[in-house]
UniProtKB/Swiss-Prot annotation:
Transmembrane segments: 6-26, 30-50, 65-85, 168-188, 225-245, 256-276, 283-303, 312-332, 334-354
Upper taxonomic lineage: Bacteria, Bacillati, Bacillota, Bacilli, Bacillales
Keyword Cytoplasm among record annotations: no
Organism, as annotated: Bacillus subtilis (strain 168)
GO biological process, one term: transmembrane transport
Membrane topology recorded in Swiss-Prot or TrEMBL: Multi-pass membrane protein
Keyword annotations: Cell membrane, Membrane, Transmembrane, Transmembrane helix, Transport
A single GO cellular-component term on record: plasma membrane
Family label: Belongs to the autoinducer-2 exporter (AI-2E) (TC 2.A.86) family.
Protein name in the entry: Putative transport protein YtvI
Superkingdom assignment: Bacteria
Annotated compartments: Cell membrane
């Protein structure tokens, strides 16, 4: 066999093995390294600010890093305080307005029982009495089976809910530890950013350093674009919801629009977690015009999200809209709602490798081409 083909085969095998090994190592080490990955992301965000303060203030870098971290912590605490205040205000509003609605709902259930369920029960009882003995026994057996199954499922659901309570409290110390380690790692990474960068330049080959720098720049640009795109999408959702609720004369339209915009960011929940129960409640309590109005508003939010998300994402991260749409669909089919984030992220990484010429470098290595 030709020597070059053997070399190509083994180099291809080496590249595939290294790629698979890197993915496996990243996957299995993630539970141990994710606080430091968070720190790396935070450090990459704040170090330009620290560099600017180094030039302007002339203070030691340690003081500038502490100042920037303190500012970000205070900003996060401020946002959290505002959210808690909004939740408290909303809870007080619900405590004032819910009792009459609950009373209306109970009255509706009583009316439904007396006008529909009880007559239906009487009719079914008459039909049951007209059946033969073996048919009655069969129906009773099926009802008992359904009852046992429902009781079993209800017990399992209750046990899962009760198990989640100690798990939640057990997560609090771990969350606090992760937060502390992430902040400490962010401080040290940012303080020694240039030293660590120089150390990596000395350790890694020039070609790897150049490609890594280019890929990092592309990924940073894409990440910034992704955050901007999400901010734009949330803002559009908030504006549409605010206008719709204002037209429907719903109280606290601004607060509700703000909360729906934030919930719309969550992959598993989305705006539907607010709209769907709201529409059901309005329908049950007989407020059909309001329910139809909220339903139309929900459809408008859904349609605008589906139409604008691929276009805004593609424009922000510099990827073709069709490729973005394919990535969103493939990610959703493979990984569910989390795939809506994972799909574009993988596409961004592939795009970064193509743009920076890293794939070309790998291909040149495999095909034994000299540069």
């Amino acid at each position: 066999m030709n020597q070059s083909y053997i070399t190509i085969f083994f180099r291809t095998l080496f590249v595939i093995s290294m790629t698979a090994g890197s993915i496996a190592a990243a996957y299995y080490s993630f539970p141990l390294t994710y606080p430091f990955l968070i720190a790396l992301i935070l450090s990459s965000v704040i170090h330009p600010v620290v560099d600017y303060l180094d030039k302007v203030t002339g203070f030691p870098r340690t003081i500038n890093v502490l100042g920037v971290l303190a500012f970000f912590l205070l900003a996060a605490f401020g946002v959290l305080t505002i959210l808690v205040a909004e939740i408290v205000t909303g809870t007080a509003y619900l405590a004032k307005t819910l009792p009459p609605h609950i009373s209306t709902f109970i009255s509706y259930c009583e009316k439904l029982f007396t006008t529909h369920i009880q007559p239906l029960y009487n009719e079914l009882t008459l039909l049951f009495q007209e059946l033969e003995t073996n048919q009655q026994a069969s129906i009773v057996t099926h009802i008992q089976t359904l009852g046992d199954s429902a009781a079993k499922n209800a017990g399992l659901l209750l046990s899962h809910i009760l198990e989640m309570i100690p798990r939640f409290f057990a997560l609090l110390p771990n969350t606090a530890a992760v937060l502390i380690f992430s902040l400490l790692a962010t401080f040290f990474m940012t303080k020694d950013w240039h030293k660590l960068k120089a150390m990596l330049v000395l350790i890694l080959p020039d070609r790897v350093t150049a490609n890594s720098k280019a890929i990092s720049s592309e990924l940073k640009k894409a990440m910034t674009g992704f955050i901007k795109a999400q901010a734009v999408l949330v803002f559009i959702t908030m504006v549409i919801v605010f206008i719709g609720l204002s037209l429907l004369k719903v109280e606290h339209a601004a607060t509700i629009a703000f909360l729906i915009g934030l919930v719309d960011l969550l992959p598993y929940l989305g705006a539907g977690s607010v709209f769907v129960p709201w529409i059901l409640y309005l329908s049950i309590t007989g407020q059909l015009p309001q329910a139809i109005g909220i339903g139309i508003l929900y459809l408008v939010v859904l349609i605008q999200r589906q139409l604008t998300e691929p276009k805004i994402l593609s424009k922000s991260i510099g990827i073709d809209p069709l490729a973005t749409l394919i990535a969103l669909f493939a990610g959703f089919k493979l990984f569910g709602f989390l795939g809506l984030i994972a799909g574009p992220a993988v596409l961004v990484i592939i795009q970064a490798f193509i743009t920076t010429g890293a794939l070309k470098e790998i291909w040149s290595y495999i095909t034994v081409q000299q540069k």
